[in-house]
């Protein structure tokens, strides 16, 4: 399997991108990586780490898409950017997956306009996995589509279901519709229409769920439009970050707290690991005609390595073909 990695995307590019790629080719069998970006910079990082293997190559790209550029314009105008070059490798069949920690908006535009959508899929959705009390959960969509139709949400649910079943090995994952109340009649026109459609599918649909129920692990796939999904995601990240800061402050405020904190250090370490985004790799753009993984902007080497592992599993489990097959089932049932 060949994986295209945007070597210039993210806060720590290209240093930690290269480090993550080296770790991945050493750990995972059957992968070859093409790093796109400024050749001299990437080669210097490989040389620093004394890598002289044949599982990593460089494709030169002189331009970089920054996070403050208009996404669609950047993808269309910066043809010699590291992100576009990586996407084009997948489009041309020279790679089977693309990974970038660069601009989320630009990668979304690239997934749509460079890779294209799977035939029959209305919108590509961003579907991150997050740690829950019982097990990881997915938000679909987490910001790619702020305005949606009910049938889009059904497709998001289907693609999330495929990911859980194929990639994570979870049979019959639960699907919940994010809403302001659990009752069927709650919500706006979008959620009411989506509820009716989801109820008619063969998904394990448990009905409406309130945002507070999501981190409890009450559902595997939380379905919503991108505006709601991104709000839930950012709130969740903010609460988790502040929780650790507040806890640390309280522990350090007294001698008793410091002693208790020292005794509970292994527990806190394990607890913090559950909230470590690097464990999850990245967020897949589901519905694109190619495997596309968005790594966190501040990804370290471990996060890149795990994003590469994630892309490999998606490829091995034939996630694109599985989405196509499941889409056919929806169409047959007029949904």
Swiss-Prot record:
Record flagged with keyword Cell cycle: no
Reaction catalyzed: a fatty acyl-[ACP] + phosphate = an acyl phosphate + holo-[ACP]
Pathway as given in its UniProt record: Lipid metabolism; phospholipid metabolism
GO cellular component: cytoplasm
Gene: plsX
Species of origin: Clostridium botulinum (strain ATCC 19397 / Type A)
UniProt-listed GO biological process terms: fatty acid biosynthetic process; phospholipid biosynthetic process
Family under the similarity heading: Belongs to the PlsX family.
A Pfam family that the UniProt record links to this protein: FA_synthesis
Coiled-coil region: none
EC number in record: 2.3.1.274
Summary of the function given for this chain in its UniProt record: Catalyzes the reversible formation of acyl-phosphate (acyl-PO(4)) from acyl-[acyl-carrier-protein] (acyl-ACP). This enzyme utilizes acyl-ACP as fatty acyl donor, but not acyl-CoA.
Gene Ontology molecular-function annotations: phosphate:acyl-[acyl carrier protein] acyltransferase activity
Keyword S-adenosyl-L-methionine assigned: no
Keywords: Cytoplasm, Lipid biosynthesis, Lipid metabolism, Phospholipid biosynthesis, Phospholipid metabolism, Transferase
Compartment(s) of residence: Cytoplasm
The protein's enzyme class: transferase
Subunit (UniProt): Homodimer. Probably interacts with PlsY.
InterPro entries per record: FA_synthesis (IPR003664), Phospholipid_synth_PlsX-like (IPR012281)
Highest taxon of source: Bacteria
Protein name, UniProt field: Phosphate acyltransferase
